[in-house]
Design a protein with these regions (language model features):
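Alpha-helix C-terminal capping segments
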Residues: 22, 115-116
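Thiol/selenol-based redox catalytic cores and closely related redox-interacting motifs
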Residues: 36-115
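Local sequence-structure signature of Cys/Sec-based thiol-disulfide redox active-site neighborhoods
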Residues: 1-21, 29-32
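Short glycine-rich hinge loops at helix-strand junctions in the catalytic core
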Residues: 26
Length: 116
């Protein structure tokens, strides 16, 4: 994962703002449309490691799929949560900017500046 990536949802205003910030800084990165392209569990685990957070911390709790899959169940394993995030990428908080050994969740969007 040497190339910089932005996990991007074009329908999300925060994600669009983060994209603009990175473009204005002339950053070289790949836009990964994670809702359209398959997100592998191994890639998601690397992102979690770079963020230094547990899978549960990356969940969007307001999504219908969160409630439908009982993700508020504290007994769900990290492995199961990662599996559900790959199956239902809408569950993943966004945007996420990944560069070198670091990653940040772009909330607020200016947080992407922390790792450039």
């Amino acid at each position: 994962m040497d190339k910089a990536f932005l996990l991007h949802n074009p329908r999300c205003s925060k994600s669009r703002q983060a994209l603009e910030i990175l473009k204005n800084k002339n950053e070289d990165f790949i836009v990964f449309l994670y809702l359209e392209e398959k997100l592998e569990a191994s890639f998601l685990k690397k992102i979690l490691s770079k963020l230094s957070i547990e899978p549960r911390q990356l969940l969007r709790k307001g999504e219908a799929v969160y409630k439908e899959n009982n993700l508020n169940d504290e007994n769900l394993s990290d492995k199961k949560i990662v599996e559900l995030m790959t199956r239902f990428p809408k569950l993943i908080e966004r945007p996420i900017f990944i560069k070198n050994k670091k990653a940040v969740i772009g909330r607020p969007p200016e947080k992407v500046l922390e790792i450039i």
